[in-house]
Amino acid sequence: PKNDFQVLEYDAASGQACVYDLYLYKGGYNDDGITVKLVVDPSVLDVYNVENGLELKVMPDRYFAFDPEVRLSGDRVMDRAEIRFDAASMLADGIDSSYVLPLSVRADDQGKVRPEKNSVIIRVEMK
């Protein structure tokens, strides 16, 4: 992913699932497969808050779900992880856009993740 802040706009009246597709890319000369792990990482948000003078909070884990591992096989240079948000519960519980999901991407021992592309912060904004 890009190291930045992503906004997922969601129309609660749409009846559709609230899903963010996080695209992961494999680069370099690595023909072997690699498994990367997605980890909720509050330290990513801590840095972002300090750098931007904000007080965003980590979204409680009951409001989202994702597969923590993504496998990029040897010939596959890109895959996506589906981050699913429970928009109905978020609305019912008053979880607003001050709550975000900070994620880090970590590689297994077969590779490494470029520091400038190893994290993302996702905010869900209800329309």
Task: Go through the PLM ranges and name each one.
Residues 1-61, 65, 78, 90-102, ...:
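Acidic/polar, low-complexity intrinsically disordered N-terminal segments immediately downstream
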